[in-house]
Amino acid sequence: QSLIKRIVICGPESTGKSTMTKNLSAHFNSNYVDEFAREFLQKKWDDSKEVCSREDLLEIAKGQIELENIKIKNSSKLIFCDTNISTTLAWSKTHFDGYFDPWLLSQSKLLKYDYYLLLNTDVTWIKDDLRDTPNDREKMFLAHKFELDNLNVNYDIIKGSDFNKRLRQAVDYIKKSINFD
C-alpha cells in the first residue's frame, strides 16, 4: 500500500473537486475516495436542518481517513482523494475563528500524500444545501494554500473557468509530478 501514490484534490467549496476527482480517476483508470464530509453533513442537514459544528470536525476527519484506508485496499498504483484532513483543518480555522483540534494538525503532518491539486475559485459558484460561503471562497483558497505550504507538500494550483482545460492541466501536472515506476 505504500507504493500506491495518493493524490489529494482540495480547494474551496464549489470549485469542482468531486468532478475533478472522478474525472482524474477515470483518466488514469484508478480508484478514488469520496469526500466524507459531504455525505456526513448532507445527512445531518436532511435529518435536522443543522450545519457543521465544531463537534463534527473530528468525526469528519476520522471518517475521511477510514474511507481512504478502505479504498486503498482495492487500489493498484494511484488513488485520488476528494479532500483530506488538511481540508478539514483549513475549514475549521476559517469557519470557527481560528479554532482547530490539535489532533487535526498532528494527523495532517503524520499522514503522507504524494501530491496535491489545489483548485482555484475561477469557476462559477453553485448553491446547494451545504454550500454557504460564496463570498468567502478566496479566503478559503488562501486558507488551503496556507495549510499546504505549512505542511511543505508538493502541489500545483488548477486555474481557469473551462472544466475540460482544468482537467487537462491537472493531468499534465500529475504526469510531470508523479513517478509512475
What are these regions (language model features)?
Residues 48-97:
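Conserved nucleotide-sensing/catalytic segment adjacent to the nucleotide-binding pocket
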Residues 13:
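The conserved Walker
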Residues 22, 26-65:
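Conserved substrate/cofactor phosphate-moiety recognition/catalytic segment
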Residues 1-4:
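Phosphate-binding P-loop
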Residues 95-164, 172, 178:
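A glycine- and Lys/Arg-enriched "phosphate-lid" helix/loop adjacent to the NTP-binding pocket
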